[in-house]
Amino acid sequence: MNLKTNELERYSRQIIIKDIGITGQRKIKNSKVLIVGLGGLGCPVAEYLSRTGVGTIGLIDHDKIDLSNIHRQSMFTTNDIGKYKVKVVTDRVKKINPNIKIKSFKKKLNQSNIKNLIKYFDIIVDGTDNFASKFLLNEFSRKLKKIFVCGAISKFDGHIFSFNFSKNTSPCLKSFYQTIPNDEVLNCEADGVVGTIASVVGSIQANEVIKNIVGIGKSLNGKVLIINLLNLDFRVRNLKKIR
């Protein structure tokens, strides 16, 4: 699918980057990315992928906005309290970039609906706040051979994972979390969270999506990036496939 004249202007500052160019921008336009969970992580992912020009973006969330969300969920304002997140993000993204297609689902992800929700998309991005959902996305992304980009945050800490399940040698989320953690682990509701870590982790997730689409850069696939903003500690750890 070719780029229109207004798209060439809109994306001109990234098209001039040698690693992207016209060819890379076409790949971005032709891609389909699903974002599950529109909170602290999903908001920056949705914003930056829409600004980057991802051609089709899927949005899944069943929750409403409350006052405690506002400090870290960058697409919402006080006036949005009580509204459904998926509706607000959909409207915002359409204003940011009217050239892209949005598929929005006001649903709670579960075992019975997940396959039909994710099968259409190339890349699945996890922005959920519980490990049951993360492991469900991990399981079905693996079964359907998708690229899966996952994030988790708590306090000043963040984890970013990327898995390319089209490769049978890829490890998975359970390679890091051997069992599903208790809800208290990396749970911003229980432990608290600063808004900045949500923005940083979400932005890196969006960047990993772009790298996977275009096929550029040093890949995080099969690895975890561990971040602590309090001590400015950034570490990459290789993951091994569980047999």
Which residue stretches match the model-derived regions?
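Adenine nucleotide-associated cytosolic modules
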Residues: 1-243
